């Protein structure tokens, strides 16, 4: 099963690779933002994104992020491995 995990954008790169540092349940990881970045990457700072296999797939609001994280925890899904 493929599951996207919510993460919050902490920092964005300024190079061609379109990477951002995203925090997922306390773990920071580099995520490609090319699929969701339509303007200035700095506009994504603080936003919640849905992460799947190293890519930010969509921007979500904080309520949706928290609800998704809660649901994943209830399923005993290992959020940190996503």
From Swiss-Prot:
GO biological process terms, semicolon-separated: protein maturation; protein-containing complex assembly
Site (Important for interaction with HypD and the precursor form of hydrogenase): 2
Summary of the knockout phenotype: Deletion of the gene abolishes the generation of active hydrogenase 2, but only reduces hydrogenase 1 activity. It does not affect the maturation of hydrogenase 3. Deletion of both hybG and hypC completely abolishes hydrogenase activity.
Annotated metabolic or biological route of this protein: Protein modification; [NiFe] hydrogenase maturation
PROSITE patterns in the record: HUPF_HYPC (PS01097)
Xref: Pfam families: HupF_HypC
A molecular function GO annotation: iron ion binding
Subunit structure as annotated in this protein's UniProt entry: Forms a complex with HypD and HypE. Interacts with the precursor form of HybC (pre-HybC), the large subunit of hydrogenase 2, and with HyaB, the large subunit of hydrogenase 1.
NCBIfam families in the record: hypC_hupF, PRK10413.1
Similarity comment: family membership: Belongs to the HupF/HypC family.
Role description: Involved in the maturation of [NiFe] hydrogenases. Involved in the biosynthesis of the Fe(CN)(2)CO cofactor. HybG delivers iron-bound CO(2) to HypD where reduction to CO probably occurs. In complex with HypD, accepts the cyanide ligand generated by HypF and HypE, and also coordinates the carbon monoxide ligand. Involved in the maturation of the hydrogenase 2. Also participates in the maturation of hydrogenase 1.
Name of this protein: Hydrogenase maturation factor HybG
Organism: Escherichia coli (strain K12)
Gene name as annotated: hybG
């Amino acid at each position: 099963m493929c599951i996207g995990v919510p993460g919050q954008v902490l920092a964005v790169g300024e190079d061609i690779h379109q990477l951002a540092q995203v925090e997922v349940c306390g773990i920071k990881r580099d995520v490609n933002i090319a699929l969701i970045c339509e303007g200035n990457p700095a506009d994504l700072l603080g936003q919640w994104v849905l992460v799947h296999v190293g890519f930010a797939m969509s921007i979500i609001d904080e309520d949706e992020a928290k609800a998704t994280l809660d649901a994943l925890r209830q399923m005993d899904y290992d959020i940190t491995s996503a």
